Regions:
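Sec-dependent bacterial lipoprotein signal peptides
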Residues: 1-56
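A cross-kingdom marker for long, charged
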Residues: 88-112, 116-148, 155-166, 171-442
């Protein structure tokens, strides 16, 4: 599915010229907190799906400079309420129930042939290799390509994501998708599948049994395992990528999908002593490939046992950008499990030591422990997607991966090796689309 400016239509917010999607773990929830909800409005023209997300009741912090208003979403801010806003689910059970309902509603829009294509057995190992950082023409995805659906079906598919994800998580995902559409429209890439996304269900949608939502395309691979009986949700494994890191949509709004991750990462880095930073940067940064086997390497680095309580919390804030994509309860429980083994977790860092995208080539870091593996890696290449005046390499091209060595895919399957030689970790200088090399011409 190709999305043009996923944050373009601001229906009730007035003159906002910069939108910076941030993910923040919501530590408190109150009854009067009505967060912004993104409502996909899909239209088809010239074979391209245009997505306009109406943002209402937006919680913002704003500063004014030269007549331009800058708005930054923040989960700790109180939100203005509007009749069209809905609140995030705050419990795991609510998320499972509303996501199952949205999935059933989506299935109801499909033909028998489409239903057969989108539904797999829960223990089908296909799901372990059908997600990737590569565009959809290079790695086969499971399920249905949203470009093959009607407008009604596309809207229903996006409602599944809206039910599954928190507001901040949904904003981050749609901003990633908007960035891929930006590359399609503005870059030198000849890859015409940019901006296309697939959706699949492994197991029947249910609030009483286990099933999975898989959604992804280039620089996006969500694997959400929901188990109503156990009352659990896990997003392990999930791939979030960004290219470019900053882009301007058709409404003139500046979109920064990973600004929240960068802010959290540098808050952690800056909290360290010089000695701790030296140990951290001397460590071994690892990167596992999306949709491939992983040895969850630790290597040398700074351990959780070396951190103060405050530093541990800042590290958990970083991790929450991946494990906390859904509701508050799910996030709290996942972080508690990770915190219990944090002393055994190894963190390593390479690259820049200040958050300044105007200098250097970006950062890479990894966090590897008994039940968490997060890797963040700047790609030293544009993958043939160059844009005049816009950085699409280093800071501007990032791959991330989140996995749980103890609970990938809700322990429903064993990870298989990537097929077709497309399992490369996407390290700096690696070849291939999305990995620093140029995709072949079509």
């Amino acid at each position: 599915m190709r999305f043009s400016g996923s944050l373009e239509s601001l229906s009730t917010i007035g003159d906002m010229h910069k939108i910076t999607p941030l993910f923040r773990f919501r530590r408190t929830a109150t009854a009067d907190t009505a967060r912004r909800r993104a409502n996909p409005i899909l239209s088809i023209g010239a074979g391209i799906v245009l997505m306009s997300v109406a943002l209402t009741g937006c919680a913002t912090t704003a500063t004014t400079s030269s007549g331009t208003t800058t708005a930054t979403s923040s989960s700790s801010s109180s939100a203005s309420t509007a009749a069209t806003t809905t609140e995030d689910a705050t419990t795991t059970a609510e998320t499972i129930s509303t996501t199952a309902e949205a999935a059933e509603a989506f299935l109801a829009t499909l033909t028998d042939e489409q239903r057969e294509a989108v539904l797999y057995d829960y223990d089908d190992e296909t799901k372990t290799t059908s997600w990737s950082n590569f565009p959809v023409t290079f790695v086969e995805r499971a399920g249905l390509n949203l470009t093959d659906l009607t407008e009604e079906q596309q809207a229903a598919a996006m409602k599944v994501l809206e039910a599954l994800l928190s507001d901040e998580g949904y904003e981050t995902v749609t901003a990633i998708m908007g960035g891929d559409e930006y590359l399609l429209e503005n870059s030198s890439s000849t890859e015409d599948s940019l901006g296309q996304y697939y959706i699949a269900f492994f197991g029947d949608p249910s609030d009483t049994s286990a099933w999975e939502v898989q959604f992804g395309g280039h620089h996006l691979g969500i694997n959400a395992s929901l188990d109503g009986t156990a009352g659990t949700i896990t997003f392990a494994p999930t791939h979030l990528g960004v290219q470019p890191a900053v882009y301007t949509n058709e409404e003139g709004e500046e979109v920064q999908p990973f600004d929240g991750i960068y802010t959290d990462a540098f808050a952690f880095f800056d909290s360290l002593t010089a000695e701790q930073q030296a140990t951290l940067t001397a460590g071994d940064v690892s990167m596992c490939a999306p949709g491939d086997t992983c040895d969850f390497s630790t290597g040398a680095g700074l351990t959780g046992a070396d951190l103060t309580d405050e530093q541990k919390q800042l590290l958990l804030d970083v991790i929450a950008n991946w494990v906390g994509l859904a509701d508050e309860e799910t996030t709290t429980e996942a972080l508690a499990e990770i915190e219990a083994t944090l002393d055994e977790t190894v963190i390593a860092w390479s690259g820049e030591t200040t958050y300044d995208m105007s200098t250097g080539d970006g950062i890479s870091f990894s966090i590897s422990g008994p039940n968490v593996y997060v890797a963040f890696q700047a790609q030293q290449g544009s993958a043939g997607a160059d844009v005049d005046g816009v950085n699409t390499s280093g800071w501007g091209h990032v791959h991330t991966i989140y996995r749980d060595p103890s609970n990938d895919y809700g322990n429903s399957v064993t990870q298989q090796a990537a097929t077709g030689g497309m399992g490369g970790a996407g390290g700096p200088g690696a070849g291939g689309p999305g990995d620093g090399g140029a995709p072949p011409s079509n």
